[in-house]
C-alpha cells in the first residue's frame, strides 16, 4: 500500500470543501441548540445540552481533520496517509465517535423523560454497548491484514446488534406513553440513526472488498462526513423537535 493517495485537483477540492461543510454544520447546530433552550420546558433542556455537546465535540474534531488533511497535502494534491508526522490522521474520527455516539443515545433517552429507573438502565447499557462497538472497530480499521479486519469487524457488530435490540424492542415499548406524534418521530429518529450508521461498516469493508486507492479515499471521506452531519446535526434537530412537541403537549405556549 502506498504512503500517499494521489488526488486530482477536483478530488482535493471536493474533500476540502466537504470537510469544511462538515465543520460549519457542527458549529451552526451547536449554536442553534444552545440558544433554543428557552423554547422548551426545563426538563427537556438536558437533551439539548447533550445535543450541543455532541456537535461541539464533532466540530472540534472536524477542525482537526480539516487541518490534518491540509497539512498532509504539502504543496500538491497527493495526501500522505502514513509514514510521516504530517500524515492524514483518520484516528480523529474514532476519538470523535467514541465520545459522541454514546452521547447521541443518551440524548435520545433524555428527551423522552422516561421513569428514572428505566432511563438509568437504558442509558448504562447503551453507553457501554456503543463504546464497545467503536472501540472494537478501531483495531480493524488500522490493521493492514484483511483477516484481522474481519475478526474485529465481527466483534464490533455484536454490540451494534445489541443496540438495535434495545432501541427497537425495549425503547419501543416505552413509546406508547408518549404524546401524539412523538412516537412516530422517535421511530424516524431510530431509522435515521441506524441508516447513517450503516455508512461506517460499508466504508470499513472497502479494503476487504479490494476497493482501495484514490476513489476509496474520496468516497470514504465523503460518506463519513455526510453520515456525521445526518447522525449529529439532523439527529440533534429532531431531538429539538421532539422536545418542542412534548413541551407543547404539557402546556408550554408556542412562540
Predicted feature locations:
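C-terminal transmembrane-bundle signature of multipass membrane proteins
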Residues: 166-169, 188-255
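Hydrophobic transmembrane alpha-helical segments in integral membrane proteins
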Residues: 2-26
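Short aromatic-rich membrane-water interface segments that cap or initiate transmembrane helices
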Residues: 9-13, 81-98, 220-226
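Internal transmembrane alpha-helix with an interfacial aromatic "cap," most often the third helix
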Residues: 30-34, 93-126, 134-142, 170
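Hydrophobic alpha-helical transmembrane segments of multi-pass membrane proteins
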Residues: 25, 47-68, 198-207
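Membrane-helix boundary/juxtamembrane motif in polytopic membrane proteins
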Residues: 120-125, 150, 171-195, 217
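Helix-loop junctions on the outward
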Residues: 59-92, 141-144
Amino acid at each position: 500500500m502506498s504512503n500517499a493517495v494521489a488526488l486530482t485537483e477536483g478530488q482535493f477540492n471536493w474533500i476540502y470543501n466537504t470537510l469544511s461543510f462538515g465543520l460549519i454544520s457542527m458549529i451552526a447546530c451547536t449554536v442553534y441548540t444552545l440558544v433554543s433552550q428557552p423554547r422548551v420546558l426545563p426538563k427537556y433542556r438536558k437533551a439539548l445540552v447533550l445535543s450541543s455537546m455532541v456537535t461541539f465535540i464533532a466540530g472540534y474534531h472536524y477542525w482537526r481533520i480539516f487541518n490534518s488533511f491540509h497539512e498532509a497535502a504539502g504543496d500538491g494534491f497527493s495526501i500522505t496517509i502514513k509514514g510521516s508526522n504530517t500524515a492524514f490522521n483518520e484516528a480523529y474520527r474514532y476519538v470523535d465517535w467514541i465520545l459522541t455516539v454514546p452521547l447521541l443515545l443518551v440524548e435520545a433517552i433524555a428527551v423522552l423523560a422516561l421513569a428514572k429507573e428505566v432511563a438509568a438502565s437504558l442509558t448504562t447499557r447503551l453507553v457501554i454497548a456503543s463504546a464497545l462497538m467503536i472501540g472494537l472497530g478501531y483495531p480493524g480499521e488500522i490493521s493492514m491484514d484483511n483477516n484481522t479486519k474481519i475478526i474485529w469487524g465481527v466483534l464490533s457488530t455484536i454490540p451494534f446488534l445489541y443496540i438495535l435490540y434495545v432501541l427497537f424492542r425495549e425503547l419501543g415499548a416505552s413509546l406508547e406513553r408518549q404524546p401524539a406524534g412523538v412516537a412516530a418521530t422517535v421511530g424516524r429518529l431510530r431509522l435515521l440513526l441506524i441508516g447513517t450508521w450503516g455508512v461506517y461498516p460499508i466504508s470499513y469493508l472497502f479494503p476487504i472488498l479490494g476497493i482501495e486507492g484514490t476513489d476509496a479515499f474520496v468516497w470514504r471521506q465523503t460518506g463519513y462526513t455526510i453520515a456525521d452531519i445526518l447522525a449529529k446535526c439532523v439527529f440533534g434537530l429532531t431531538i429539538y423537535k421532539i422536545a418542542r412537541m412534548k413541551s407543547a403537549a404539557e402546556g408550554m405556549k408556542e412562540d
